């Protein structure tokens, strides 16, 4: 695992790279809750439900990607990340008056983002982390549909999932992802949840999350009955919004609550496209490859994941 960079030019985003003192974050302005992933496992829904709680203020936009920093030439990674923007930029997205301040960036759990856990431990060492997981094959298919819809995947599902180092299999290695964070954070500050619990046992699951972050666990809102989907076609919508300068519309208008939900719903409407067929031999091949990951997650959580092996 790489160590977190502490040079002022990284932390402050200085163009000239001149040495200076690392800025002190504003008291209470940094997050103490981070939903780290996994992608296509329900992080948008969880982010929305958390933001409904009166003691919790989640970031807008949802995915700040602050701890991600990658050069454009990195194999398997698109250019992006906001590590270069500095702590003050990051802190500006959180309400200092909120008891719990959080964000949700599924890119944090990507195993290729080796610097993320140590960077987080250096900036928000007391943060509590939440990771959502789902059946790895279902997650791969959902991720594949998302990338196809955004115009970034031209190969069929079998070719894409057999491609060495592909994002679909890589981001389904949950045990590897969890262990990376446990190298920088104690076990009691990582909560791992199944998407099916959020889907079918939402009240109990949200009460558990609320207890984990230290707020009133009896809170419930009728708006939690909704499932907040990420759209398979959201990539194109987001790109269009950025070209039009509308990507931070919710934040600029100061929208919250019901208005915020409806505006985000309009630009996140799910695609009607059907899931691609998974060849049986490919499914067996992938599950065999992921067996150590499934077993590792069982050891970490105490779950019985027999249903994931078929």
Residue ranges, per PLM feature:
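Short catalytic/ligand-binding loop motif for oxyanion handling, primarily in non-cytosolic enzymes
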Residues: 44-45, 66-67, 109-113, 137-142, ...
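The conserved 3'-phosphoadenosine-5'-phosphosulfate
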Residues: 2, 62, 179-284, 288, ...
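Acidic-and-aromatic substrate-binding clefts and catalytic sites of carbohydrate-active enzymes
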Residues: 79-84, 108-114, 169, 197-201
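Surface-exposed cleft-lining segments at the edges of enzyme active sites
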Residues: 74-76, 103-108, 158-169, 196, ...
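Alpha-helical packing segments of well-folded alpha/beta enzyme cores
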Residues: 86, 90-93, 116, 174-178, ...
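PAPS-dependent sulfotransferase catalytic domain
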Residues: 118-119, 126-132, 138-204, 208
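PAPS-dependent sulfotransferase catalytic core
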Residues: 1-108, 123, 127, 137, ...
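Generic structural signal for small/hydrophobic residues in well-ordered secondary structure
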Residues: 42-43, 90, 102, 120, ...
